[in-house]
């Protein structure tokens, strides 16, 4: 069982989408099932509507979940299992105030050493705990051995006990921390494999330790994906537009192209252009590079053009909101535009009233009048050109530039001989606008 567990705290990052896609593909390969879990326990950072937005984005990418969980609905289980850890002496109540901890952290920094919890409250007797009326958090007891796990991408990874430390699992307000809620939910929901970003590597031993202390013996496999770098070779910030899946979709990149690119990123694939469904046939998580991958927006633009070319008429109607008769024209314009909006603008320009530059106005009118006189437009552009040049005596720039403006509303663009067959049936309507 695989899962994708985003938090509704902002726009979905492409790194998160990449993890969702990989988990989904692997769940289809072994038919184990796919869970979507909205991790909403950080109420201070939650943004209204983001949970639904996450679901809508996944649907656009064709990602279907077998089960949906809302993490906050598991709060009673989090508290029950935290209580079990206390009873089993695997966890303890910590009454240290924020001010006390801040002072200890400052002292450690001044001494040039990493801060570690000093175990003050772990030493308290049961009676001392009961008699203390101060607010408290619950901490796990630090492990007494190296915690190791085998990463499906990075290989074996180990963490010394001091790097695990006595970490907090329940806050003062009795809500679970990320690591505790995540560890418990994965256990309760039967998750068997987790694919996520490498920023979670240090969380994995903590989550494994929590489950071990709870007596859970089922193994969960992990794969941690290298980070995605921006085009400057730096870690991609959430503030960068291209890191937001919502922004990419609104900018005119197709879900098919984005998925294609994210699967291709840092991966060895048998071909360059493919769909998510096609990737299910050959995807291998172990072949993902251990090194960070650099995001290349121009490569994504190329893939966007390729997926527009591959799309059937029904899909193009859905994406562009244009009649099916425009399908070939849409594909034609991928030779000079990559985004949905750019292509729509070029087509809109053809079928709108033209702004004619004064220097071409006279020749445009001459060409328009002659085109409207032609009873039946010829099949090919050469014959069309021959008819017009004979009738108007216009040549070279005086012919081609006004004709291009009359037909497309643009000074530059694709070869008219290639565009003509696609517009032929509509040309009289176009010039009459």
Swiss-Prot record:
Q: What is this protein called?
A: Glutamate--tRNA ligase 2
**What is the organism of origin for this protein?**
Campylobacter hominis (strain ATCC BAA-381 / DSM 21671 / CCUG 45161 / LMG 19568 / NCTC 13146 / CH001A)
Q: PROSITE patterns from the xrefs? A: AA_TRNA_LIGASE_I (PS00178)
Please indicate the residue ranges that the annotation assigns to the motif 'KMSKS' region.
Answer: 235-239
Q: Which gene does this sequence derive from?
A: gltX2
Residue ranges for motif 'HIGH' region? 6-16
Q: Name one Pfam family in it.
A: Anticodon_2
Intracellular or extracellular location(s): Cytoplasm
Its EC number(s): 6.1.1.17
User: What are the record keywords, sorted?
Assistant: Aminoacyl-tRNA synthetase, ATP-binding, Cytoplasm, Ligase, Nucleotide-binding, Protein biosynthesis
Cite the binding residues for ATP. 238
Function text: Catalyzes the attachment of glutamate to tRNA(Glu) in a two-step reaction: glutamate is first activated by ATP to form Glu-AMP and then transferred to the acceptor end of tRNA(Glu).
Task: Show the InterPro entries listed in the entry.
Answer: aa-tRNA-synth_I_cd-bd, aa-tRNA-synth_I_codon-bd_sub2, aa-tRNA-synth_I_CS, aa_tRNA-synth_I_cd-bd_sf, Glu-tRNA-ligase_bac/mito, Glu/Gln-tRNA-synth, Glu/Gln-tRNA-synth_Ib_cat-dom, GluQ/Sye
């Amino acid at each position: 069982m695989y899962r994708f567990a985003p938090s509704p705290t902002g726009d979905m990052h492409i790194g998160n989408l990449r993890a969702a896609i990989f988990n989904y593909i692997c769940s289809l390969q072994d038919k184990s099932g796919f869970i979507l879990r909205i991790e909403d326990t950080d109420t201070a950072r939650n943004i209204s509507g983001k949970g639904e937005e996450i679901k809508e984005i996944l649907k656009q990418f064709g990602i279907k979940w077998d089960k949906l969980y809302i993490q906050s609905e598991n709060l009673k289980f989090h508290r029950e299992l935290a209580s079990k850890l206390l009873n089993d002496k695997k966890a303890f109540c910590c009454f240290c105030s924020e001010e006390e901890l801040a002072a200890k952290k400052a002292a450690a920094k001044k001494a040039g050493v990493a801060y570690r919890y000093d175990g003050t409250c772990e030493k308290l007797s049961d009676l001392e705990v009961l008699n203390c009326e101060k607010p408290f958090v619950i901490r796990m007891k630090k492990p007494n051995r190296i915690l190791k796990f085998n990463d499906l991408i990075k290989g074996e990874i180990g963490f010394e006990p001091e790097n695990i430390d006595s970490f907090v699992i329940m806050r003062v307000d009795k809500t679970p921390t990320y690591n505790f809620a995540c560890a418990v939910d994965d256990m309760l929901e039967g998750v068997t494999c987790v694919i996520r970003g490498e920023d979670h590597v240090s969380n994995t031993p903590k989550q494994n330790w929590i489950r071990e202390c709870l007596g859970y013996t089922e193994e969960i496999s992990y794969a941690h994906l290298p980070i995605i770098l921006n085009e400057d070779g730096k870690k991609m910030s959430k503030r960068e537009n291209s890191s937001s899946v919502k922004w990419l979709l609104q900018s005119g990149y197709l879900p098919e192209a984005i998925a294609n690119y994210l699967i291709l990123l840092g991966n060895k694939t048998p071909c360059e252009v493919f769909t998510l469904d096609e990737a299910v046939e050959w995807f291998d998580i172990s072949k993902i590079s251990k090194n960070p991958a650099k995001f290349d927006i121009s490569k994504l633009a190329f893939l966007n053009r390729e997926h527009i070319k591959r799309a059937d008429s029904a899909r193009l109607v859905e994406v562009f909101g244009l009649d099916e008769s425009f399908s070939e024209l849409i594909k034609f314009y991928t030779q000079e535009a990559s985004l949905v909006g750019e292509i729509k603008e070029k087509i809109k320009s053809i079928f709108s009233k033209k702004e004619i530059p004064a220097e071409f106005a006279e020749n445009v009118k001459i060409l328009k009048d002659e085109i409207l006189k032609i009873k039946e437009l010829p099949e090919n552009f050469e014959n069309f050109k021959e008819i017009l040049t004979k009738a108007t005596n216009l040549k070279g720039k005086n012919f081609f530039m006004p004709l291009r403006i009359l037909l497309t509303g643009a000074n530059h663009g694709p070869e008219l001989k290639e565009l003509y067959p696609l517009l032929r049936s509509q040309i009289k309507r176009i010039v009459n606008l």
